[in-house]
């Protein structure tokens, strides 16, 4: 156990966050995301909510300031988004600094980004469209 490191952050996740360089991307996915069929390394965080993990990592993680650092999946035509999901994520991410805008991209574009991500963290999140991509920035 380390001081000031949230116990929600596993040693494997801490290692991945440290190894990521600026511009690298990490996905925090809901429990239904097809992470194991994609290329990046997969980290399990079963039972944890995405918002809780975001709150735990944001003191350690600099978001990119040169490109949109937050991306979520847009609803498929005919589906609706639950605004509470994005609100929870924004609240968690704004604990250190104002939360940047979250952009939405279509499902297949999100899958393409996920295939190129540094890692995917599968959580116990069950909210529909509960996946979020974070782009790492340069630590000041």
UniProtKB/Swiss-Prot annotation:
Keyword Transit peptide: no
GO cellular component, one term: cytoplasm
Pathway(s) where this gene product acts: Carbohydrate metabolism; L-fucose metabolism
Keyword Disulfide bond: no
Subcellular location(s) per record: Cytoplasm
One Pfam match: RbsD_FucU
Any coiled-coil regions, as ranges: none
GO MF annotation terms: fucose binding; L-fucose mutarotase activity
Primary location recorded for the protein, binned into one broad class: cytoplasm
Active-site residue numbers: 22
Residues given in the record as substrate binding sites: 30, 107, 129-131
EC number(s) on file: 5.1.3.29
Key words of the record: Carbohydrate metabolism, Cytoplasm, Fucose metabolism, Isomerase
InterPro entries in the cross-refs: L-fucose_mutarotase (IPR023751), RbsD-like_sf (IPR023750), RbsD/FucU_mutarotase (IPR050443), RbsD_FucU (IPR007721)
Organism domain of life: Bacteria
Function: Involved in the anomeric conversion of L-fucose.
The family this protein is said to belong to: Belongs to the RbsD / FucU family. FucU mutarotase subfamily.
NCBIfam families named among the record's database cross-references: PRK15420.1
Subunit structure: Homodecamer.
Protein name: L-fucose mutarotase
Classification of source organism: Bacteria, Pseudomonadati, Pseudomonadota, Gammaproteobacteria, Enterobacterales
């Amino acid at each position: 156990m380390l001081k000031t490191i949230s116990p929600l952050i596993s040693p494997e996740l801490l290692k991945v966050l440290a190894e990521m360089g600026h511009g690298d991307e990490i996905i925090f996915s809901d429990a239904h995301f097809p992470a194991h069929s994609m290329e990046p390394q997969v980290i399990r965080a079963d039972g944890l909510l995405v918002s809780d993990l975001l709150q735990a990592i944001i003191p350690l993680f600099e978001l990119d300031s040169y490109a949109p650092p937050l991306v979520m999946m847009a609803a498929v035509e005919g589906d609706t988004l639950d605004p509470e999901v994005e609100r929870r994520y924004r609240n968690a991410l704004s604990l250190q600094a104002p939360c940047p805008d979250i952009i939405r991209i279509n499902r297949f574009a999100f899958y393409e980004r996920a295939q190129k991500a540094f890692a995917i963290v599968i959580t116990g999140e069950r909210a529909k469209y509960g996946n979020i991509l974070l782009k790492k920035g340069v630590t000041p």
